């Protein structure tokens, strides 16, 4: 049973599509900014390993909630890789990062040639952070909310990756 949260959505009633899109871009951008500052300030106040561990905890929980909500809101009934990909296309980070999703008969491959998080760190003179465990938890939580049979395999992820690709993931049933 989902409890509805009271929100005043009346501002959207008079918005045309371009204005709604502009606002959606604003929300997505600030979603990413909050996530980034949260991580940076935890690392600054404590240390990088603590920030990474806390990030892993957050990202092993939030995607499960998102997947369940997306299934409900968008009436996604498919299971397996089809249902996973359909829900994943609505997922906030798919939109923010621009996951390249390759669907094959027995597997799905997600590639990330341009990772906004790692690229921002490099621009600021910071090293890439170890994100494999965090993303494994994220993808497993999301995938298992769609179908617990889905297996997640990291092909590679920062800091160990080829120069033209930050990470690549394989999903199978």
Predicted segments — roles?
Residues 1-109, 116-134, 144-168, 173:
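N-terminal accessory segment detector
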Residues 135-139:
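Long, well-ordered alpha-helical scaffolding segments within enzyme catalytic domains
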